[in-house]
Each structure stands twice: as C-alpha cells, then as structure tokens.
Amino acid sequence: MKTKNRPPRRRTPMQDAEATPGEQTPDRSQSGSGASEVTKGLRSRTARASGTRAEVSRRRQGSSSRRENSVQRRLESNERERQRMHKLNNAFQALREVIPHVRADKKLSKIETLTLAKNYIKSLTATILTMSSSRLPGLEAPGPAPGPKLYQHYHHQQQQQQQQQQVAGAVLGVTEDQPQGHLQRYSTQIHSFREGS
C-alpha cells in the first residue's frame, strides 16, 4: 500500500472575531494597509466558518423535521385511503343488500354487484316505460314519438341492442323464437351468476 506524503497544512492562527485591528497583539499586527487586509481576511474566514456551522446545523434540523413531516404526511395519506376504501366497501354492501339476487351463501363480488345493478336498473326502466307507454296515446302512433325524452333514448338504445343481437345470432346461426322479457332475462342472469360461482 502506498502512502501519500503530504506536506503538513499550515494553519493561520484564528483571531477573535470581535477583535479590532487596534486590539491586535503587536507580534501579529503589521504596519499599513496590509494589516487591515489580513484582518479582514481572517474575519471573513471566521464568519464563513461560523456561518457554515450554522448552516450545517440548520440543515440537520431541517432534514430531520422534513423526515418527520414526510412520515406524518404518509400516515395521514394512509389514513385517508383507509377511510376511502371503508366508505367504498360500505357502499358496495348497501348496493348488495338492495339488489335482488339468489346467492345467500356467498357475497357477490364487486363486478357481479355492478353488473347486476346495471341490468336490474335497465330491466326496471324497461318495465316502467312499457307500463307508461300503454297509458300515453302519443307513444303508440306511427312516426316519431312525441313522448318523453327518456323513452325515446331508451327505445333507440333497445333498437340498437336488438340489431346487434340479431347480427350476432345470424353469425352464430342462433335464432330466438320467443323474445324474453327484461325481468325474465335479469332473473336468468342471477341464476347464471349463482351457478358460475
């Protein structure tokens, strides 16, 4: 192993920062403007050194407080996320209790709950619109229906779905002899969820 030979460092004796050029000891003072320049240099060096020490201590204090703040923020964030998930799970449980389904031994998954809820809403909407369309004389007339916009929108969606089902049935070679009612389709889907799981 090689050792490095370095010359010993020369240290300039540090003067007291409060000392003025007049208070210097005679052996260290120099005559003329050179003495004041040396004193200024020593003072600035002393001030820089004490300022650096203060900065380092501030950095240490700042980094520890930053670390504590970071930990605190992370804990608060985790708690907010826990509360959010708790609320979400409670909402899913409330939805499971409202939707009619057959399986009582095992709770529905989130995707099953959402799918059944969507289809249940669609079937109820279709039933309500079917019941209300028989009472509205304007909806049975040929041509564009002057009825409610909800009915028109739903009727348009149903026509598109029927066309897609007919195209899919023609491609697969399946024909539907008797169209099923909306509630009957929904109950069939409930039973398929029960058998599938």
Swiss-Prot record:
Keywords: DNA-binding, Nucleus, Phosphoprotein, Repressor, Transcription, Transcription regulation. It is found in: Nucleus. Expressed in liver, spleen and olfactory epithelium. Weaker expression is seen in skeletal muscle, cardiac muscle, eye and brain tissue. One of its GO terms (molecular function) is DNA-binding transcription factor activity, RNA polymerase II-specific. It comes from the Eukaryota. Forms homodimers or heterodimers with TCF3 gene products E12 and E47. These dimers bind to the E-box site, however, heterodimer with MYOD1 does not bind target DNA. This is Class A basic helix-loop-helix protein 15.
